[in-house]
Amino acid sequence: MKIVALTLVAFVALAGASCPYAAPAQAYSAPAAPSGYPAPPCPTNYLFSCQPNLAPAPCAQEAQAPAYGSAGAYTEQVPRYVGSPNREQVQQFHQRIGMAALMEELRGLGQGIQGQQY
């Protein structure tokens, strides 16, 4: 065990010695003027969902001063498809899970009885 530990320490020391020293990075300074890319043209955006229809989503308005580049062009809220369930929905879910487990258990018992010979 001591040999393994000694070998590991020697390997780590060798690996550390072979790596060049990296000087600490300089502090980041923000650019003087904001720069950005122009927003791509947006004729029609579609929000996709599980429903068969597509609903067009409007493009965001141009960014006002101070301009933040193209990041200001995409300010639409993220759609929320599923809200938090109420108590009745949670109870129905638990009942369905319980019934599914019961049906699976009864299926297993039925197959076990059919496979037995009397």
Swiss-Prot record:
This is Vitelline membrane protein Vm32E. It comes from Drosophila sechellia. Major early eggshell protein. It is found in: Secreted. Keywords: Secreted, Signal. GO terms for biological process: vitelline membrane formation involved in chorion-containing eggshell formation. The keyword Signal applies. Its main location: secreted. Residues 1-17 form the signal peptide. GO terms for molecular function: structural constituent of vitelline membrane. InterPro entries: Vitelline_membr_Cys-rich-dom. Residues 36-75 form the VM domain. Belongs to the vitelline membrane family.
